[in-house]
Every structure is written in structure tokens, then in C-alpha cells.
Amino acid sequence: MFAVIKTGGRQYRVVPDDVLEIGKIAGDVGTIVQLGEVLVLGGDTPVLGLPTVAGASVAAEVLQHKRGPKVIAFKKRRRKHSKRKRGYRDEITVLRITEILADGKTPTVGPRPKKEKVVEPAEGEGDH
């Protein structure tokens, strides 16, 4: 099953376990957020929204908040000793799609457990 969602003025085709970089949204790292603007639900019988599919949403886990690459806007007017250089970086949220929900259901999956780091003793330590 897939869905086409709209967030931040852009549309994304998603399936469960997709990792997605979108414009910054509210939510702490590790929490589940719901994206409610579902335009299309695909599968055995596709459902097209007019403009959105009623009762459908997509649940996603917030993996990270970060800043995107620097975009430089440089303007130069030749032979005029005039130039302007500006740059900016977008705020980005990285999401993992956990579930595609139809008919007003709520997410059943909580945040994934974090893997514990196993620290092995270095050679020579431990047998004195």
C-alpha cells in the first residue's frame, strides 16, 4: 500500500519504512507524528481524494531535526563594482513512515526501541 501526502507545499509518494526529508515540523525526536493531508491511497483499489481522502492519515516517527545544505544567492552586476552574496540553510525534519492509516484509525506502533551499544573490554583489561 502507498500514499501520496502533501506537507510544506510539496507532495511525496510514501510506503511504510520510507525515510523522508521534509520541511521542519513540530515534534520531538522519537515521537510519532500524523500527516493528515493524504491525496491518494494506493493498493488493490486506489482511492483518490477530492482534494484529500477523508479519514486517512500517515503516521511517521521523527528521526532527526537538522539543517539542509547551504544555498547561495549571488548577484553580480558586471562593470559596476556591485555584487551581493547571501546564503541560507533550510530547517529539515527526517521522518520514517511507520503506517498508512485509513478510515480514521490511530497509529498502533510506538517509537522503535533504540539499539543498546555493547562495549567490549579491550584486550589486556579484565585479567590482572
From Swiss-Prot:
GO terms for cellular component: cytoplasm; ribonucleoprotein complex; ribosome. Coiled coil: none annotated. GO terms for molecular function: rRNA binding; structural constituent of ribosome. Residues 104-128 are annotated as: Disordered. Residues 116-128 have a biased composition (Basic and acidic residues). Keywords: Ribonucleoprotein, Ribosomal protein, RNA-binding, rRNA-binding. SUPFAM superfamilies: L21p-like. GO terms for biological process: translation. It holds the Pfam family Ribosomal_L21p. This protein binds to 23S rRNA in the presence of protein L20. HAMAP family: Ribosomal_bL21 (MF_01363). Belongs to the bacterial ribosomal protein bL21 family. Part of the 50S ribosomal subunit. Contacts protein L20. This is Large ribosomal subunit protein bL21. It comes from Nitrobacter hamburgensis (strain DSM 10229 / NCIMB 13809 / X14). The gene is rplU.
